[in-house]
A protein has these predicted regions:
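Helix-start/capping segments and mature chain N-termini
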Residues: 1-83, 112-211
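Short, glycine/charge-rich beta-strand/loop segments that flank catalytic centers
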Residues: 72-83, 92-109
Length: 211
């Protein structure tokens, strides 16, 4: 994407290293976003995606917060489907396995100084994966983090950008050293209200009600 031409030159190429200028805006000011989704192979051998348009819409919201151009929903879904079609032999069929798909977008302009970049790339990589946790689908131990915070009101907590995850690594390392698999983050102001768990959804069943 460039200011002059918009999105252009879509293509599928073999995976390999990419070249970046040392002054690339992304390396200094973290103007990048990403998504995470999976393709599954059914018992009948059919390959299925789960609501890819929702991932596309979430990326649009993330991009807006970071002053990055919108990548249209139809182009996003088309790109994902095209890549999965090419790599369909890599979609595993064993229980608890899938093809992990990582769409991401980043600024490519080479310039120092905080500003909205004038050029971006949207890319997708993928690979077969097993269960995310060593415990599989069994219960995992979660540490309630009451010192560090992941998101604050008015911040970027609702976006999928690298800075959010870089800021959460210290809490994750702390949890793992104590024998936990993940972190339950509390609110940034009072440190007592449940916000989220780092890599999964969370819900509570209280007196028969699901929250």
């Amino acid at each position: 994407w460039t200011k002059e031409d918009g999105w252009k030159d879509a293509r599928i190429v073999p995976e390999g290293p990419i070249t970046m200028d040392p002054a690339c805006v992304t390396l200094h000011y973290a103007q990048e976003t990403f998504e995470g989704m999976k393709a599954y192979r059914t018992a009948e051998g059919k390959i299925q995606l789960f609501r890819p348009e929702m991932n596309a819409k979430r990326m649009i919201n993330s991009n807006a917060r970071l002053c990055m151009p919108e990548f249209p929903v139809d182009m996003f879904v088309e790109a994902v489907k095209a890549l999965v079609k090419v790599e369909e032999d890599w979609v595993p069929s064993e229980p608890e396995t899938s093809l992990y798909i990582r769409p991401f977008m980043f600024a490519t302009e080479a310039a120092l100084g905080v500003h909205m970049a004038s050029a971006y790339k949207f890319m997708i990589i993928c690979c077969p994966v097993g269960a995310y946790y060593a415990e599989g689908i069994n219960p995992v131990k979660i540490l309630v983090e009451d010192e560090l915070v992941r998101a604050v009101k008015g911040g970027t907590g609702f976006t999928k950008c690298g800075g959010n995850y870089a800021g959460s690594i210290l809490g994750q390392v702390k949890a793992e050293k104590m024998g936990y698999s993940q972190v339950l983050w509390l609110d940034g102001e009072h440190r007592k209200y449940v916000e989220e768990v780092g890599t999964m959804n969370i819900m509570f069943k209280i007196a028969g009600e699901i929250y």
